[in-house]
Amino acid sequence: MKKLIIALVAMFSMTFTTASAMSYEQARQQALFLTDKMAYELNLTDDQYEAAYEINLDYLMGVDTYDDLYGVYWRQRNLDLSYILLDWQYRNFCAASYFYRPLYWDAGYFHFGIYARYPRRDYFF
């Protein structure tokens, strides 16, 4: 009986702390929207845009759980972006929380902070 209760508690705690990974199509759309806004605000070149898109896509594809939000993939993403952005671009990137921390967790789901700044999800520059 004790083992059953422990197993049930473990199962419920895992259910509330995990989320399903994004599909490739959803990650691609989110990375494209995020990178488009980065290009607009940070004045990215074409080469920077392509590299930032790939970096953002890799990060979004790597996020599966709450722990992944600001884990290894997030640190690698920001490190990679520091290599492709100029100093002033990277400072502005870090100052904008919707770029620096593109995902946040609320009520058991991932949310994209960029939509607080740009609510029209179908508008690209």
Predicted regions and their residues:
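Low-complexity segments
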Residues: E25, Q29-D36, Y40, D46-F125
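Bacterial Sec-dependent N-terminal signal peptides
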Residues: M1-Q26
